């Protein structure tokens, strides 16, 4: 029964990582729960083996002993003899989240760990909600960091913030095209852009493909960011630099991933669901979509030509900061 359960564990699934929990601790917890589930299954009936037992002959009044062939159960594979059937599982982690961040975290079990590499090579976008707080700056861009400056923010308006976000998105879209090595003059590049298939060819700095403000009530604001190749620290730095562009300061109070590629919050398992049955069901439900999305993302696209020169007005190495802006732009 345990082997049958293991065969249904190969694949990808998503969990919801709460803030304050390190990704490695989460991975170890999931592995432990899976091992408990596999080892809790009823062991198969012991195999019978033939043994020759010494005993008196049947129907004989004499005390002469003889060997008699007898079928007895073999306990050589019983858990009480050899220990648990499963002592280790291969559990891999996709795009990681640091301890302070929360949200969708993709895990792979068994052969599913190879699919994590495919997800990385597909350069899929991820969605975040990022909360900011105007009026102060810290050494690590987090609210609980060491305070280095306090400023006023009465002059900040929703219109000014939206203007800054539009400039950010425009500069990063140019960078996305540059790192994709596409010739913008070709029909193939246009069709790929329409289909949303433009991706960097290799590793690149953080690229923002979409950003907007969901909530603005100074000093608090909430951003929705769609990006790739990011770290959570870079997203916190983004909030800091937005504050500078607004002629004030800002710190990040929350980073929450709401989508990682084709995995969303709806498909992420809560902490109370990190058990064998729920994870098997999640892997089975995700398998068709994983296969379809990876095939679409990794399949050779339209023929493209490499640009000899990006031709942009800013540095050919990409934006020099998270914003890719000159100081004071967008005001």
From Swiss-Prot:
Q: Which CDD domains match?
A: PseudoU_synth_hTruB2_like (cd02868)
Q: Which SUPFAM superfamilies match?
A: Pseudouridine synthase
Catalytic residue positions: 98
- Does the record's keyword annotation contain Isomerase? yes
**What InterPro entries does the entry give?**
PsdUridine_synth_cat_dom_sf, PsdUridine_synth_N, Trub2
Presence of the UniProt keyword Mitochondrion in the record: yes
According to the UniProt record, what class of enzyme is this? isomerase
Where is the protein localized?
A: Mitochondrion matrix
Which terms are listed as keywords in the entry? Isomerase, Mitochondrion, mRNA processing, Transit peptide, tRNA processing
Q: Which domain of life does the UniProt lineage start with? A: Eukaryota
Q: Name one GO molecular function term.
A: RNA binding
- What ranges does the record give for the region Disordered, renumbered to this chain? 296-331
Query: What's an example GO cellular component term for this entry?
Result: mitochondrial matrix
**The EC number(s) this enzyme carries:** 5.4.99.-, 5.4.99.25
Query: What's any GO biological process attached to this entry?
Result: tRNA processing
- Report biased composition (Polar residues) as residue ranges: 314-323
Transit peptide extent on chain? 1-10
Q: Which Gene3D superfamilies has this protein been placed in? A: Pseudouridine synthase (3.30.2350.10)
Q: Show the catalytic activity.
A: a uridine in mRNA = a pseudouridine in mRNA; uridine(55) in tRNA = pseudouridine(55) in tRNA
Q: What does this protein do?
A: Minor enzyme contributing to the isomerization of uridine to pseudouridine (pseudouridylation) of specific mitochondrial mRNAs (mt-mRNAs) such as COXI and COXIII mt-mRNAs. As a component of a functional protein-RNA module, consisting of RCC1L, NGRN, RPUSD3, RPUSD4, TRUB2, FASTKD2 and 16S mitochondrial ribosomal RNA (16S mt-rRNA), controls 16S mt-rRNA abundance and is required for intra-mitochondrial translation. Also catalyzes pseudouridylation of some tRNAs, including synthesis of pseudouridine(55) from uracil-55, in the psi GC loop of a subset of tRNAs.
Q: Say which family it is in.
A: Belongs to the pseudouridine synthase TruB family.
Tell me, how does this one assemble? Forms a regulatory protein-RNA complex, consisting of RCC1L, NGRN, RPUSD3, RPUSD4, TRUB2, FASTKD2 and 16S mt-rRNA.
What is this protein called in UniProt? Pseudouridylate synthase TRUB2, mitochondrial
């Amino acid at each position: 029964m345990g082997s049958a359960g293991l065969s249904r564990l190969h694949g990808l699934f998503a969990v919801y990582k709460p803030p304050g929990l390190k990704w490695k601790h989460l991975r170890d917890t999931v592995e432990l729960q899976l091992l408990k589930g596999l080892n809790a299954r009823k062991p198969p009936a012991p195999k019978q083996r033939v043994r020759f037992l010494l005993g008196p002959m049947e129907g004989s009044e004499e005390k002469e002993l003889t060997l008699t062939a007898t079928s007895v159960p073999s306990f050589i594979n019983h858990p009480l003899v050899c220990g648990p059937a499963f002592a280790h599982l291969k559990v891999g982690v996709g795009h990681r989240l640091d301890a302070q961040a929360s949200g969708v975290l993709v895990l792979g079990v068994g052969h599913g760990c190879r699919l994590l590499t495919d997800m990385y090579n597909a350069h899929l976008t991820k969605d975040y909600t990022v909360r900011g707080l105007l009026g102060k700056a810290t050494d690590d861009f987090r609210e609980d960091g060491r305070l280095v400056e306090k400023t006023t923010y009465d002059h900040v308006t929703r219109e000014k913030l939206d203007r800054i976000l539009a400039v950010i998105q425009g500069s990063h879209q140019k960078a996305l095209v540059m790192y994709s090595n596409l010739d913008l003059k070709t029909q193939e590049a246009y069709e790929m852009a329409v289909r949303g298939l433009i991706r960097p060819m290799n590793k690149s700095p953080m690229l923002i493909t979409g950003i907007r403000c969901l909530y603005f009530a100074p000093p608090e604001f909430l951003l929705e960011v769609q990006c790739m190749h990011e770290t959570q620290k870079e997203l916190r730095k983004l909030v800091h630099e937005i504050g500078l562009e607004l002629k004030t300061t800002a710190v990040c109070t929350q980073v929450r991933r709401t989508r990682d590629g084709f995995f969303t919050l709806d498909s992420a398992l809560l902490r109370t669901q990190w058990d064998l049955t729920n994870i098997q069901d999640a892997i089975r439900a995700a398998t068709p979509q994983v296969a379809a999305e990876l095939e679409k993302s990794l399949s050779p696209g339209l023929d493209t030509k490499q640009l000899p020169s990006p031709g942009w007005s800013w540095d050919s190495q990409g934006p020099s900061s998270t914003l890719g802006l000159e100081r004071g732009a967008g005001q």
